[in-house]
Structure formats: structure tokens, C-alpha cells
Amino acid sequence: MDISRTEQRILHLMAQGGRIEISRDDDRKIENVSCFTRDGWLYPGVDLDLFRRLKRLKAIKSSGGQPYRITERGLTLVRSQLDNR
């Protein structure tokens, strides 16, 4: 399955240890999505639509109220890239 360039970029970041945190409003609806690198830096470019697409693809998942992490399916979707470290 092909995924877009932005989805690929976020999944690669999450495969290296990144996470997605959400904040909810008073009605328990998701109002804000933030993506953090493994070093704790806020990564721009993740919006609610991209978050929903990744969730629909079952590439990310949250368990026990923890931040969203990449799943095994997400790891198979992401194409390998060279790490700059």
C-alpha cells in the first residue's frame, strides 16, 4: 500500500522513537495533535487530518492513555530511510 510523503515522514520519525500526543476539549473530542521526536522536540506538520489517516491505516495506536506510538503495521508501511545520526 502506498502512503503519502507526509505520512511516510511522520511514520519514519515515529519508528525512531517519536510519539503523538493529543489534547481533548470538554466534550472529549480531539482538538489538538502534537508530534514529538525521540529527543523531545515538537515536530511541525502533523494536523488532525493526518492523525486520522494514520489511525485509519492502523499505523499508530495508543494503549492505556499513553501517547500514540507506531504499530507493527506502521513499521511495514514505512520504507527504510538512512538515519542521519
UniProtKB/Swiss-Prot annotation:
Q: Name one Pfam family in it.
A: YjhX_toxin
Give the similarity note: Belongs to the UPF0386 family.
UniProt-listed NCBIfam families:
PRK13687.1
**Protein name per its UniProtKB record:** UPF0386 protein RHECIAT_CH0001945
Q: Which organism is it from?
A: Rhizobium etli (strain CIAT 652)
